[in-house]
Amino acid sequence: MQCLLLLPFLLLGTVSALHLENDAPHLESLETQADLGQDLDSSKEQERDLALTEEVIQAEGEEVKASACQDNFEDEEAMESDPAALDKDFQCPREEDIVEVQGSPRCKICRYLLVRTPKTFAEAQNVCSRCYGGNLVSIHDFNFNYRIQCCTSTVNQAQVWIGGNLRGWFLWKRFCWTDGSHWNFAYWSPGQPGNGQGSCVALCTKGGYWRRAQCDKQLPFVCSF
């Protein structure tokens, strides 16, 4: 009789044990899914942080690039060691030393002058600014580059200064115009500017190609105003 009374309890225990065994994999699966969900959320947060960091770095890089052309003659080579030297014995070019260059359709009210008297890059920019209220010329298309080249081919020099110069720091160096206009055109000689030396840009009187040159070199120059 006692065995018969104990039998239902034994059966109940066996069934409960089977239920626990069947539920165990389901619980483990739920825990695994929860862990995977946490890992996925963590991965998404890391991706967002990384993307934000890259955006910040890129934005800072663009700011550095923009500021490079906003600074005036930050490159030591382009700047005279003593700014007062620019004022020493300063004289504007004589009439016989200048030649008017045909204007550009891009700016119908602008004037352009070829100054035959050789100057360093900084001295030439100083003359353009103080004598004519302008800058060394900026060139934005092939046709105007050709006009400049045709006019300068009459001078007894291989090159003339135009308003391009290299500014910035390390990887953020870039070519800029002294008048602050956008650098949207270039006509480099083969191998230039990568194999060139110097931080200033000169136009070759034969062919009209551009070359990098040492800024303290004395050359004729073209002003725009």
Curated annotation (Swiss-Prot):
Listed name of the protein: Proteoglycan 3
PROSITE patterns cross-referenced by the UniProt entry: C_TYPE_LECTIN_1 (PS00615), C_TYPE_LECTIN_2 (PS50041)
Cellular component GO terms held in the UniProt record: collagen-containing extracellular matrix; extracellular region; specific granule lumen; tertiary granule lumen
SMART domains listed in its UniProt record: CLECT
Cystine pairs: C128-C223, C200-C215
Keywords: Disulfide bond, Lectin, Signal
Originating organism: Homo sapiens (Human)
GO MF term set: carbohydrate binding; extracellular matrix structural constituent conferring compression resistance
